[in-house]
Structure formats: structure tokens, C-alpha cells
A protein has these predicted regions:
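Glycine-centered beta-turn/loop sites at beta-strand termini
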Residues: 15-17, 24, 33-35, 42-44, ...
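Leucine-rich solenoid repeat scaffolds
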Residues: 129-166
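Short glycine-aromatic motifs
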Residues: 12, 29-32, 73, 109, ...
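Sec/Tat signal peptide C-region and signal peptidase I cleavage site
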Residues: 6-12
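All-beta strand scaffolds that present successive hydrophobic residues in beta-strands
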Residues: 17-19, 118, 138, 156-157
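Bacterial N-terminal signal peptides
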Residues: 1-4
Length: 166
């Protein structure tokens, strides 16, 4: 929502058990799918976008704020979870998820079960992919990245500079 003065207000979007499509406002939004195969996207501001069940597509959307972390999350189901050009916290949760960080300094967590695929994108990223039995695949992209992973289980690309096998 935008006031006449040009100030962007935050909005809350709360979905249904059915498939929903939400695109956030220019302000900082809280978007939650609540079931179904949702398509959810933030748009400016510092957003929190959550899939909450179903096979969801969740993204931070365009216009994030550099150095201020947005939070984008899947949930149960096989989700696609993507950050944006700013700093993001990306979480897939359970299910076989595809997670992409984007251009900023991102924190990506792929350790809640399932077989996850991570593309950290550019920027100096931190990827946590340990504490689950799934065989995760991690590509760090550009930047100086740090990865905590399950040794002997996860597949970590050569472009991941700092590795911490568990």
C-alpha cells in the first residue's frame, strides 16, 4: 500500500488451503500461502514470504534492500525458493527443494530433510546443508562462500571456497 505522501506501507497476505498467487507491495510484507501449490513473491521492502504446505514457488521478488535480509521459505512439499538481488535468508524445509540465493550475501539452509538442490548465486554466501540424510547438491556460484555439509553424502561443487564437512 502506498500513501499519498509516497510512503510504502507493509502488507500482510494470508492465503487459503487452495493454490494462491500473491505479489507483495513496495513496503515490507508478510506473505503466507497456507497450503495448496502457491506462487508467492515479495516486491520491495524487507519481506517474509512463506509457502506453508503444497509444492510452492516462493521468491523475494524484485527490489530488495541491499544489506537487509529478506526471508523466503518453502515448507512441506517440493518447493522452489528464490532470493533476489539483495541479502536473503532462503530455507526449503522438508521436501525435495530447489533453492537459489540471488546476487546478495545470502544465508541458505538446506538441512530439514529431502534431497535439495542449492544454487547460491553471486555474493558471499553461507550454505548450511548438514543434519539430514538427504543427498543435497550445492553450487556456490560467484563470491567467497562457506558451506557446512554432510561429508560422504552431499555433493559440493568445486566453486565452494570454504568447506566444513560434518
Amino acid at each position: 500500500m502506498l500513501l499519498a505522501s509516497g510512503v510504502a506501507l507493509a502488507a500482510t497476505f494470508d492465503g487459503t488451503p487452495e493454490p494462491d498467487t500473491f505479489v507483495g507491495s513496495p513496503g515490507s510484507d508478510d506473505i503466507r500461502g497456507r497450503g495448496g501449490g502457491d506462487n508467492l513473491s515479495g516486491a520491495g521492502g524487507i519481506d517474509r514470504v512463506r509457502g506453508d504446505g503444497g509444492n510452492d514457488s516462493v521468491s523475494g521478488g524484485p527490489g530488495g534492500i541491499p544489506d537487509r535480509r529478506e526471508r523466503v521459505e518453502g515448507d512441506t512439499g517440493n518447493d522452489t525458493v528464490s532470493g533476489d538481488e539483495g541479502a536473503d535468508e532462503v530455507r526449503g524445509h522438508s521436501g525435495d527443494d530447489y533453492m537459489r540465493g540471488g546476487d546478495g550475501a545470502d544465508f541458505i539452509r538446506a538441512d530439514d530433510g529431502g534431497i535439495d538442490t542449492v544454487n547460491a548465486g553471486s555474493g558471499d554466501d553461507v550454505v548450511e546443508a548438514h543434519e539430514d540424510a538427504g543427498k543435497d547438491t550445492i553450487d556456490c556460484g560467484e563470491g567467497i562462500d562457506t558451506v557446512d555439509f554432510d561429508a560422504g553424502v552431499d555433493v559440493v561443487a568445486d566453486n565452494c571456497e570454504n568447506r566444513d564437512p560434518h
